[in-house]
Amino acid sequence: MQVTETLNEGLKREIKVVVPAGDLEAKLAERLETARGRARINGFRPGKVPTAHLRKMYGKSFMAEIVNEILNDSSRSILAERNEKSATQPEVIMSEDEKEAEKVLDGKADFVFSLNYEVLPAIEVKDFSKIAVTREVVDISDEEVDEQVKRIASSTRTFETKKGKAENEDRVTIDYLGKLDGEPFEGGADNDAQLVLGSGQFIPGFEEQLIGLKAGDEKVITVTFPAEYGAAHLAGKEATFDIKVKEVAKPNELVLDDETAKKLGIESLERLRQVVREQIESQYGQITRQKVKRQILDALDGDYQFETPQKLVDAEFNNIWQQINFDLQQAGRTFEDEETTEEAAREEYRKLAERRVRLGLVLSEIGEKAGVEVTEEELQRAVYDQVRRYPGQEKEIYDFLRRTPDAVANLRAPIFEQKVVDHLLANINVTDKKVSKEELTAEDEDAASEAKPAKKAAAKKKAAPKKKAEEGKSEEA
């Protein structure tokens, strides 16, 4: 096999490979001889089938197998010999001339093909011990825990029908019909809807107009949907709602005791407080870690500048772009609604894709140099967590993961990255800073540098007056 480098520009490589017809013939002769000893063909004794007869019957199919084996093995062997790592699976380019292909299969022509690929850039790990980050820490007060316990326990609160007017914290049962310009709109109606006044369950201005109503009262209220409302056809629009009050109920006293905790599946009130404190600590801890990680990534981004494999960047950009367009479509919005243009958005997300790829390569190199590994136990736990997300489909998901190495690799990657971040945290300068929970959870304008850019399509909301909590999705690097 003759290997010749025909392109070496930056990270791009092109390798021409020529397998002489004589080499192919030698491999075919060896395969025919092996087959001759096993062949069972009518008219011939076992092991005595003439090679020429076997060649006539199986020559082309055997040669096709040989060619495929060469293609499968060549990338790995050539990269190993050149001491290179390909960023993606090398692209194989062969002649599309059918006559030429027939000559190769007939053993009358050399097998010629090219490998096109990009190499992973050589990265020299720099001294990261000088990186300094600030870790924000929140002291969790007993009052905050008790407040959260009350919110959780309020789901067990009972209500008692009353005859008077509805007040704040009362529960009203209503029928409502929403209209735009006098016409009902989809998703804007419900019967026997229960609403605790003051809970903020419905859009602003809705609940306040129900205060003072009694069972049997009917009223038409006017509200304006928030400008950022997820359903684009309702955002910023004024709507009316025909309201019929069917019941007003006052809340009974909320008792916080062991019995209340048991209704929530917790053995005691003390244990409930402990669980709530742990949940708050975990929530704040995740935010803190994200902020610290962002500082680390920003520091690394400033320290490492090198050419990135364009195919990796293209793949990352395509993933981002697909998600962005899906978000916009779901929300019924356009780039203009997001105060940008498609061209500007493409440029912005392209930069984000390049940053992610570059930082991913840096973290990978740091982890490799530090001997960071994902254990089988950690990977199995990730597989279990993934399978558990699909109740009723556990077997199908498990089988899919078992036969799809790339899917398992996608589970391994974030574990590896988190362990590399842990390694960095143990070797850089970390200063703890006490902050309030408001400071910790404040919107970070720079978050786009490691997550999605600030201009982002909002999640679609149901076209009803109920507010839906949006869950933020942070994507690393």
UniProtKB/Swiss-Prot annotation:
Domain of life: Bacteria
Catalysed reactions, as listed in the record: [protein]-peptidylproline (omega=180) = [protein]-peptidylproline (omega=0)
Region (Disordered): 435-477
Keyword ATP-binding: no
Keyword Cytoplasm tagged: yes
Listed GO MF terms: peptidyl-prolyl cis-trans isomerase activity; protein folding chaperone; ribosome binding
Domain PPIase FKBP-type: 169-254
Family in the record: Belongs to the FKBP-type PPIase family. Tig subfamily.
Record's protein name: Trigger factor
Species of the source: Brucella ovis (strain ATCC 25840 / 63/290 / NCTC 10512)
Lineage of producing organism: Bacteria, Pseudomonadati, Pseudomonadota, Alphaproteobacteria, Hyphomicrobiales
Originating gene: tig
